[in-house]
Amino acid sequence: MAEIVTWVMVSYFLSINLIYLLLMALSARALVSNGHFREMEELPDAFSLLSPPISILVPAFNESRTIVATVESLLQLSYAEFEVVVINDGSKDNMLEVLQTRFALVPYPEAYRIQIPTQTVRAIYRSTLYPNLRVIDKENGGKADSLNAGINASRYPLFCGVDADSILQRDSLQKVVKPFLRSPEMVAT
């Protein structure tokens, strides 16, 4: 009699556990098929508050026709904290005037740390419309020299260099910062 009770109890617990296992498998399949498991870049904007701030560096030379569209698209990015630093690399066209007019730039006296040698920086401007937009006006030295000037002026630990005719997707910064969040010792991607 005791053996029968033991087998009934074991069978009961075994069948209950198998049913629970089946329910968990079906639930996991439903979660995956309904898209409830998401990658980090698909998380809501609130999660980007945990992401490190980024400086977007835009070296530009004679880009008066495309620079406004580029800067406007960069200012529309979906990221918690970032700045856009446009570096006018001694343009011969009216690019600086176009930027001053469209973004209400005013001279901005700020400390400029010379950590990397560059051509002479003539002035730094700040937008009165967009507090996260600055423009550096410098003598011509090429794209690498402009990026170095942008690094010297950047406020944030991460920077991303983009061409002056680039249009980025709204979630681009969230995707770019992902490797830095996964591996804090990373220095470049």
Language-model features: locations:
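N-terminal membrane-anchoring/stem segments of glycan-assembly enzymes
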Residues: 1-48
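Glycine-rich, basic loop-to-helix element that forms the pyrophosphate-binding segment
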Residues: 42, 70, 115-154, 174-175
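Cell-envelope/extracellular polymer assembly enzymes that use nucleotide-activated donors
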Residues: 52-55, 83
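Short, acidic, metal-binding catalytic loop of nucleotide-sugar glycosyltransferases
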Residues: 72-81, 101-109
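A conserved acidic beta->alpha catalytic loop
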Residues: 88-108
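Short aromatic/hydrophobic "clamp" motif used to bind/position activated sugar donors
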Residues: 159
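The conserved acidic donor/metal-binding loop of glycosyltransferases
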Residues: 163-167
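Conserved donor NDP-sugar-binding/catalytic core segment of glycosyltransferases
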Residues: 170-189
